[in-house]
């Protein structure tokens, strides 16, 4: 069981699961390892399941994994899942053009542990603003489009497809996106319990190979992304409107990217410093405490027979 959320930052996971089943069915699989997708509604639920051992692997927020590892919870990041994919949305009829126009406004974020919040803080710092210059509201991402429509918030910062949902409906537009402002943005990372690493390294390696293969395949051509949308929209995975997922994949095509899954120490150090400044992590945590690079270093991207 591999846990994930119905967000496009997790799109490599449904592709990987279906690709492995296709390889087994075709008789081309190198091994019999199977990976079953388990959908969760929020990060706290995945966190609890990983901590309790109900699942052995899942996509998690990178700062949350850092914090868990620092608290001696036996988990390690073994791969990225994507890059970019967060947006700051405002109403189409609003006058906001510059980020600084949001001074004094109500802005929704998923949580203070979310990397979306760090993106927001990064944008604030560029304008010599602080979180005290806006009103921050924590809100589940699925509720954000309706809140913006009802004028309950002035803007929201979150991952896709919850920005695209409002944009496609016509009442919201993108003010800023990580694609333009934070190109190497990292949010969701593949996290595995240490006991699985110790007991079945080949299985973990196969999962990393599949995720890397899925990432390359997704970024290879638009037709592959169209196939991924059809897979992920199904009830066994995201159970979402395929038109909204398709919108994310096309507007623009690099709104979320998946091929570059390198784990670069300096990028994680930057993420940690931002988290410390935000108060969600209390002190620097050694890279090796929460990262196991061995699987990415040994990765051979799996063929995706879809």
Task: Give a label for each model feature.
Residues 63, 94, 137, 142-237:
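Pocket-lining segment of extracytoplasmic ligand-binding domains
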Residues 70-72, 89-90, 168-170, 187-189, ...:
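Short secondary-structure transition/capping segments
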Residues 80-82, 87, 231, 243-245, ...:
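Amphipathic, soluble alpha/beta structural segments
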Residues 1-130, 135-138, 154-161, 171-177, ...:
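Short, glycine-/small- and polar/acidic-enriched structural segments
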Residues 198-283:
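Secondary-structure end/capping motifs
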